[in-house]
């Protein structure tokens, strides 16, 4: 019926990594992760005290290398962001100077166009006024007493 050694009372929950009861797997301190990105794990419980000094040195070297890599990556990211900012500033400066030159040219062109239009209007007005004045003179000549005397004779 029931197997004699499989009672709940006899089975203790223990660590799956090291097998010791009293702590769970996520609480295990007998294993160290060398690289958090990779699954490299060192078993501390199985090492002797003589080997621990050597392994500690190796661990320290590995951790130092990791820190260097992380620092280098962060520095690269910072440099890239700085370069982007510099490029944006350069673009803005060059863009603004180009627009100032363009806008100055455009303003000159607009001013010249306005002047030409004014000149054309003045010429056309002069012509119109001149024609009106001619008509008035003709009417005056016809209605003038001297003109009427000449026509009667």
UniProtKB/Swiss-Prot annotation:
Organism, as annotated: Mus musculus (Mouse)
Zinc finger (CCHC-type): 13-30
Role played: Possible splicing regulator involved in the control of cellular survival.
The protein, known as: Protein SREK1IP1
Keywords: Metal-binding, mRNA processing, mRNA splicing, Phosphoprotein, Zinc, Zinc-finger
Superkingdom of this protein's organism: Eukaryota
Pfam families: zf-CCHC_3
Annotated Basic residues bias: 85-94, 106-141
Keyword Nucleotide-binding: no
């Amino acid at each position: 019926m029931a197997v004699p050694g499989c009672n709940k009372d006899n089975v203790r929950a223990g660590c799956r990594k090291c097998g010791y009861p009293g702590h769970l797997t996520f609480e295990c301190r007998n294993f160290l992760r060398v690289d958090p990105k990779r699954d490299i794990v060192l078993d501390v419980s199985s090492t002797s005290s003589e080997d621990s000094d050597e392994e500690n040195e190796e661990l320290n070297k590995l951790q130092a290398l990791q820190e260097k890599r992380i620092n280098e990556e962060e520095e690269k990211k910072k440099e890239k962001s700085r370069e982007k900012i510099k490029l944006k500033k350069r673009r803005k400066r060059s863009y603004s100077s180009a627009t100032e030159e363009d806008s100055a040219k455009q303003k000159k062109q607009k001013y010249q166009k306005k002047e030409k239009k004014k000149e054309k209007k003045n010429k056309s007005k002069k012509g119109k006024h001149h024609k009106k004045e001619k008509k008035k003179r003709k009417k005056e000549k016809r209605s003038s007493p001297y003109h009427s005397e000449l026509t009667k004779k």
